[in-house]
Amino acid sequence: MSMDTFVDERDFTLLEHDRYSFFVLHRIIEGNCRLLLSDHENLIICYTGEPYPVWIWTADGSPTEIMGKAYRLAAENGFVNNGQRFNVKYDLAEYMIRRAAEEGKELYISTNMFAYDCPEPVSPSVKADGGIHRCTAEDLDELVEFLEVFHQEIGIDRKDATGHRA
């Protein structure tokens, strides 16, 4: 099946059946995407831009043919072997890493997600000190420092203070 550059109700239905790992993709594909490809049955590829990962949705238990198509499209769009991060299921991650290695490329899947949808959050057993504060312009220096430390700790999307202020 050919790939379209739009999504429709068919895609939203696919994602609705995959709520635990790809629920947030429903919201992402409704926004501005640099790349959006879908066959409306087996494969959705979405990329909004740096510093965000490429999202590749495939159905559970997808055949090698679909995983190969996903890899080929990722490569054709410049996402393979350039340090790009991906949100993909484990089967596709393993396939893409193996395929890249066969081609003499190194590919790392550094972003894994488990669940974004949490309809019944669990309250903490111990009440934390403090409260919620909405940031204002006066909090910019503290927010930039927080972002810098956070990104240093996780080792991705590293920018200097000027980059975090943008």
Describe each model-derived feature in a short phrase.
Residues 1-22, 122-159:
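Short amphipathic alpha-helix that is part of the acyltransferase structural core
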Residues 1-31, 82-100:
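An N-terminal domain-start capping segment
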Residues 24-25, 67-70, 96, 150, ...:
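Generic structural signal of hydrophobic/aromatic residues within well-ordered alpha-helices
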Residues 25-49, 166:
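Conserved beta-hairpin
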Residues 33, 43, 50-129:
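Acyl-donor-binding surface of acyltransferase catalytic domains
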Residues 49-50, 154-166:
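A conserved beta-strand-loop-helix scaffold within acyl/acetyltransferase catalytic domains
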Residues 73-77, 104-107, 133-136, 151-154, ...:
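Short, low-complexity, polar/charged sequence segments that are solvent-exposed and flexible
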Residues 117-119, 147, 163-165:
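Short C-terminal domain-edge/linker segments immediately following a structured domain
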